[in-house]
Amino acid sequence: MASIFSKLLTGRNASLLFATMGTSVLTTGYLLNRQKVCAEVREQPRLFPPSADYPDLRKHNNCMAECLTPAIYAKLRNKVTPNGYTLDQCIQTGVDNPGHPFIKTVGMVAGDEESYEVFADLFDPVIKLRHNGYDPRVMKHTTDLDASKITQGQFDEHYVLSSRVRTGRSIRGLSLPPACTRAERREVENVAITALEGLKGDLAGRYYKLSEMTEQDQQRLIDDHFLFDKPVSPLLTCAGMARDWPDARGIWHNYDKTFLIWINEEDHTRVISMEKGGNMKRVFERFCRGLKEVERLIQERGWEFMWNERLGYILTCPSNLGTGLRAGVHVRIPKLSKDPRFSKILENLRLQKRGTGGVDTAAVADVYDISNIDRIGRSEVELVQIVIDGVNYLVDCEKKLERGQDIKVPPPLPQFGKK
């Protein structure tokens, strides 16, 4: 049986204890990592057998529902992460939300970094299903933030109206948004804004707390695609990510509004580089430079991001594991978007489309949000290059259709590891 002292030195307890003692949190993170590998997973006895608790998923259409079997549920139901997160908490959002008519949702979230290990028997097959066959049990993820490798990164701005790259980062030693306490959420905010104050040059900016904004200011930023929406999505609310809203939430942006950090929405942080026009290479260069600088500043203050070789960067939703990267453009393609081959072209190019305002919105004036569908198994450079090559292909198709010429469905891109 674990001693009282070893229990004290797990999860959030250790972070708070060492912070109180003035110990470097980087050292704390190292100690927590060692414990995480060695600590026994706690069991939480239940009154009823697993079969009595198994959720009714017969009408569900999400990755969790497809992968969760009675046997897996029975094996994992009583397990608890060092921070106290359970399997039922992981899957609740997928139980409450059966599915999406057009997009197959994941249906589960992680409450902490350890969730992906303690409940790996479910997370691993869900990750494999969601990520085009990426198997975290046998594969490793690579990271590459060298923007100089990008080619053909300038789009035709008659068609491409804006360009954007985003990712997420989680701070090791603190629970993720579905499970974090108020104190942890406020600590995330404090760690982030203290580090961001060190940004210089074109990255320098300021932080705006959501609780200090007027409703009008919030809506203006949302309409301009600078700020996250209010937490009305059932996927967020059922996962517990809207608790205490808007406490410790906010947005940091540079003075040009081309480099932004969202704090405490779905993830601890979301890092975004964006601008009008079609210069994706410049957007990605700023993204890489800013992200590296943010990580350096956070590490200087004794913290680090969650990362491992199996899963890459750890984020709340399994759909964002690996790079967490979504590179997208707003592109006007009135003729191609009406062509019956459009969906197949996107599928083969490993791209996805959304409406002008994002998920669940319509395309206004034939403008679509086109982005990469994959997150893990390919590096950041590879994913951005896929978007660049793919969007250039879409624009070329649009030009051919304007001239009355035929277009072709491209061959499907090879999966990772088959280059």
UniProtKB/Swiss-Prot annotation:
The modification Phosphotyrosine is found at residue 255. One of its GO terms (biological process) is muscle contraction. It is a peripheral membrane protein. ATP binds at residues 162-166, 225, 270, 326, 354-359, 369. Residues 40-64 are annotated as: Cardiolipin-binding. GO terms for molecular function: ATP binding; creatine kinase activity. Mitochondrial creatine kinase binds cardiolipin. This is Creatine kinase S-type, mitochondrial. Keywords: ATP-binding, Kinase, Membrane, Mitochondrion, Mitochondrion inner membrane, Nucleotide-binding, Phosphoprotein, Transferase, Transit peptide. Reversibly catalyzes the transfer of phosphate between ATP and various phosphogens (e.g. creatine phosphate). Creatine kinase isoenzymes play a central role in energy transduction in tissues with large, fluctuating energy demands, such as skeletal muscle, heart, brain and spermatozoa. It is an enzyme of class 2 (transferase). PANTHER family: ARGININE OR CREATINE KINASE, CREATINE KINASE S-TYPE, MITOCHONDRIAL. The keyword Transferase applies. Sarcomere-specific. Found only in heart and skeletal muscles. Belongs to the ATP:guanido phosphotransferase family.
